[in-house]
A protein has these predicted regions:
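Conserved "HGTGT" condensation-loop signature of ketosynthase/thiolase-family condensing enzymes
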Residues: 1-299
Length: 299
């Protein structure tokens, strides 16, 4: 899959260089919530989240609408269509607790009509993105806000959420991004199959590679990662350090996978990393997935 990252919004701002600097230096934008969630049978504690300051105090739907409006404004679809073919638009957007879209298709049509004067391309709305079957010339617009008490308390029923002074868990955030898959894309993504250790073998991964983790943090995951990478080490090697996207900007919900591609772009297009040939992007939800991202030959 060849692609370009067109724009993004998260707690670090809108510039790839700011995102790279923040993640590479493990900068923290997180804060404890005012509300408490149940951690176990005997403990309530604030959860840790990363909120975009300008969106604080707003409800999830309003946040998502503002994020979408800003992405469309930054994108300039009308100009983009003059230089790039767009066969379809895929909106990766959240649903509410009743499994209804947070942003309706009618609203999406209205927003697109405001920014595109000519015929609007076909679009679909989904909550998941199948990275192995994305067609070329697809414009992917993904966003979510995952910091509300309602969202996190529901999430905590099936996941380990990071709470104040608690064990490793998911830090939630909010943001969005836009990708375009096309044959002239400046970045190329190669996905591997099988169990995590098999994927690492297929990729010929080594301890000196750059690994970007954009998944759900937990102690169980850390143990699994160490177990699967043991074979990569020789006695003198230092421990692999995962650049952790979600510890910096928070887990982006349904937009988390595309956000990982934004991070990879920020690493490969940073002047400080001119000699960096590729990075390995790593997801662990719903399954472990290793993706090698490199600069395209035609870029």
């Amino acid at each position: 899959m060849k692609f370009d990252v067109l724009c993004h919004i998260n707690a670090t701002g809108c510039k790839p260089s700011s995102l790279y600097t923040a993640v590479a230096n493990q900068m923290l934008f997180s804060k404890p919530s005012k509300a408490l969630i149940r951690c176990d049978v005997s403990l309530d504690a604030p959860y840790i989240m990363v909120e975009i300051e300008e969106l604080a105090q707003l409800d999830r739907q309003t946040k998502c609408l503002l994020l979408l409006s800003q992405l469309l404004e930054n994108l300039d679809i009308a100009t983009l269509r003059k230089t790039s073919r767009i066969s379809q638009i895929v909106f990766v957007l959240p649903q509410d607790e009743l499994n209804n879209p947070v942003i309706s298709d009618d609203t999406l049509s209205e927003l697109l009509a405001e920014v595109i004067s000519q015929q609007i391309p076909d679009f679909i709305q989904t909550t998941t993105l199948d990275l192995k079957s994305i067609a070329p010339d697809t414009l992917i617009i993904a966003l979510d806000s995952c910091v509300s008490y309602q969202y996190v308390s529901h999430q905590a029923k099936n996941n380990v959420v990071q709470v104040l002074n608690g064990p490793p868990g998911i830090i939630n955030g909010e943001g969005g991004c836009v990708l375009l898959t096309h044959l002239q894309g400046t970045l190329s993504a190669h996905l591997y199959n099988g169990e995590l250790n098999e994927q690492l073998n297929q990729a010929e991964a080594c301890v000196n590679d750059t690994y970007l983790f954009a998944g759900k943090e937990s102690l169980a995951w850390q143990k699994k990662w160490f177990a699967n990478t043991q074979a990569l080490y020789s006695p003198e090697d230092e421990l692999i350090e995962l650049a952790n996207l979600n510890n910096t900007i928070g887990h982006q919900g349904v937009a988390n996978d595309p956000a990982g591609f934004v991070l990879a772009n920020s690493y490969l297009n940073n002047p400080l990393n001119e000699g960096l040939q590729h990075v390995f992007l790593l997801f662990n939800s719903p399954n472990e997935q290793l993706i090698k991202i490199s600069r395209s030959e035609n870029s």
